[in-house]
């Protein structure tokens, strides 16, 4: 039996890193992920008829991955991006009720959060960082209250050994409206009075951007190694790559040779 069907003219995404569908046989419902309003959001449907009961999340931001569903309390724990101020590729943990009420960010600390939870989700740890700020691990409870700082990475030795901090930036895309984000790497001997060739590290494709993950990394690919050869190295998540709105992702659908990266980066 076919309960529900969604058809799109371009890509269909069921989530960012995996499928966000869930079936709840006890209550005769299912959770559906859709980008039909241009952003990836969650919807609750009747399992028998397929009819929409209610939209759970909404707005100009996206649900990334459903991590846990509590069918007793009717709460959904999920990661999202673009709702908090700043870089839309930063990942935060949220909790929301099945009916769409009670949406709360459980990890408001700025950065990309990696979550590990107890089986009952009464407690969890979050390790968060940015491209320039090293990881901090916190222990929190189900309500998002911080119980303890578990660990803070010390990068003093990196700094003593001339580690170079990447520079996060945003510029307007090809339409002069959309903000696109990237990282810039300078050689350790950089002199603002000198000219340097620019190496644009392009990875075009609808499945991934050039950066994607803006968490802390001692060495992201060979970006800094190339910079040390005398280049200014940049990587940009251009229009046509995932992790943003559907229209952003669809920017060069069906025309990969056009490589959106070139249109946004030149």
Predicted regions and their residues:
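Secondary-structure transition/capping motifs at alpha-helix termini
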Residues: 36-37, 45-53, 85, 174, ...
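Structural motif
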Residues: 39-43, 87-92, 133-138
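Multi-bladed beta-propeller domains
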Residues: 1-19, 45-72, 81-83, 96-113, ...
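Short glycine/proline-enriched, acidic/aromatic patches that form the donor-sugar handling elements
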Residues: 85-88, 241-243
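Serine-hydrolase catalytic core recognition
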Residues: 105-107, 112-264
């Amino acid at each position: 039996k076919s309960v529900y069907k969604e058809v799109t003219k371009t890509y269909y995404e069921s989530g960012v890193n995996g499928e966000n569908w869930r079936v709840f046989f006890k209550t005769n419902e299912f959770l559906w992920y859709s980008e039909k309003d241009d952003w990836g959001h969650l919807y609750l449907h009747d399992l028998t008829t397929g009819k929409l009961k209610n939209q759970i999340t909404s707005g100009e931001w996206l649900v990334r991955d459903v991590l846990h569903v509590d069918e007793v309390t009717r709460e959904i724990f999920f990661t999202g991006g673009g709702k908090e101020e700043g870089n839309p590729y930063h990942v935060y943990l949220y909790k929301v009720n099945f009916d769409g009420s009670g949406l709360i960010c459980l990890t408001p600390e700025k950065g990309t959060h990696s979550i590990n939870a107890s089986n009952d989700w009464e407690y969890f740890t979050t390790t968060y960082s940015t491209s320039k700020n090293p990881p901090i691990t916190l222990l929190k409870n189900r309500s998002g209250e911080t119980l303890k700082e578990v660990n803070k990475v010390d990068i003093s030795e990196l700094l003593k050994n001339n580690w170079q901090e990447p520079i996060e930036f945003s510029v307007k895309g090809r339409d002069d409206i959309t903000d696109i984000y990237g990282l810039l790497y300078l050689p350790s001997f950089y002199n603002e009075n000198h000219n340097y060739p620019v190496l644009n590290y392009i990875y075009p494709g609808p499945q991934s951007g050039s950066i994607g993950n803006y968490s802390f990394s001692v060495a992201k690919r060979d970006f800094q190694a190339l910079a040390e050869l005398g280049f200014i190295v940049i990587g940009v998540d251009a229009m046509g790559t995932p992790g943003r709105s559907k229209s952003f992702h669809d920017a060069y659908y069906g025309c990969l040779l056009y490589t959106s990266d070139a249109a946004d980066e030149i």
